[in-house]
């Protein structure tokens, strides 16, 4: 999936700057090679998928790198780097993929009792427990098509201690991820934004480069989607204000209508029982101010305590 996204960026760069030679460099990070450990053991998504690539940009090995924005940590300073471009946002919602013989009505009627839902995202796990109070959420990793194959074949998910969990009855996944690997037909149910607020930046592809590499920044600016970039700035400002870490069930999503932006963000505990949310609107050309206001409102409602309780010990 990451390769397909990178190839799309290369096509767009060649379209706006046909004289440049775009070389795609494949990186296998710790998060790619280790498909059994929880991402938290590699420093969260930032440590697993982003940190090694960032080092390559800073060293000059790469001019730029593609990231799924939701995988980029938003609570840490990244001196020397900048998001040079974001692509137009893909559908940001989360969906349910079910094994044969299971329906969404089965889950709702039973409140999830006797069912196992697979995900590796703490936000999705918290929302799953909130929506289906008696469900068992199991650690489930792998590429989108690999996870669906495991579901269909009733395969167990290996754990780093040598054990295993599963098999899963359902998976919660990103709609855009399934679409990219041609598995949109497996979507059994799409959660509304009200039911399951997306992760900050979900559906946005970002291109990061060195902050002082003005030639690369100028080229990336030519493929930048302004609305997507403003949404990224607003949502990531919430993460910065909350100092949310990789194990924090934090969600955030913004929309733009004309000159106005609306932003909603939430913080949950891992069990899904504690839930706080804040929503505000403001000028679309001042996204960070809006994100800061929403983040401060969440802090006033007690977000810091929930986040601290979820912090790894």
Mark where each language-model region is.
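Short gly/ser-rich anion-binding loops that grip negatively charged ligand groups
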Residues: 43-47, 55, 86
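A conserved helix-loop-strand patch within extracytoplasmic ligand-binding domains
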Residues: 69-73, 78-134
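Glycine-rich, N-terminal phosphate-binding loop and its surrounding beta-alpha-beta segment
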Residues: 48-68
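Structured loop/turn residues at beta-strand edges in well-structured enzyme cores
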Residues: 60, 79, 166
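Small-molecule-sensing regulatory modules
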Residues: 1-36, 40-43, 50, 68-72, ...
């Amino acid at each position: 999936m990451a390769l397909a996204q990178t190839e799309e960026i290369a096509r767009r760069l060649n379209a706006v700057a046909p004289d440049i030679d775009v070389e795609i460099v494949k990186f296998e990070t710790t998060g790619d090679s280790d498909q059994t450990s929880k991402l938290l053991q590699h420093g969260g998504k930032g440590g697993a998928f982003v940190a090694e690539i960032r080092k390559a940009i800073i060293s000059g090995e790469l001019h730029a790198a593609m990231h799924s924005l939701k995988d980029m940590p938003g609570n840490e300073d990244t001196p020397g780097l900048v998001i040079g471009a974001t692509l137009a946002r893909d559908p940001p919602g989360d969906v349910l993929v079910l094994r044969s013989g299971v329906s969404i009505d089965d889950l709702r009627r039973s409140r999830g009792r006797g069912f196992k839902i697979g995900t590796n995202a703490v936000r999705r796990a918290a929302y799953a427990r909130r929506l289906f109070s008696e469900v068992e959420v199991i650690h489930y990793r792998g590429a989108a098509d690999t996870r669906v194959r495991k579901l269909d074949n009733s395969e167990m998910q290996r754990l780093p201690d040598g054990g295993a969990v599963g098999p899963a009855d359902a998976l919660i996944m990103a709609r855009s991820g399934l679409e990219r690997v041609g598995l949109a037909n497996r979507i059994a149910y799409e959660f509304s934004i009200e039911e399951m607020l997306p992760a900050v930046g979900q559906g946005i592809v970002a291109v990061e480069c060195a902050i002082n590499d003005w030639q690369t920044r100028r080229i990336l600016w030519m493929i930048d989607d302004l609305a997507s970039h403003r949404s990224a700035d607003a949502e990531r400002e919430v993460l910065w204000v909350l100092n949310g870490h990789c194990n924090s069930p934090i969600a955030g999503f913004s929309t733009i209508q004309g000159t106005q932006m609306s932003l909603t963000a939430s913080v949950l505990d891992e069990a899904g029982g504690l839930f706080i949310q804040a929503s505000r609107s403001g000028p679309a050309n001042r996204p960070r101010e809006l994100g800061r206001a929403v983040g401060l409102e969440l802090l006033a409602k007690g977000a810091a305590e929930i986040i601290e309780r979820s912090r790894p010990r």
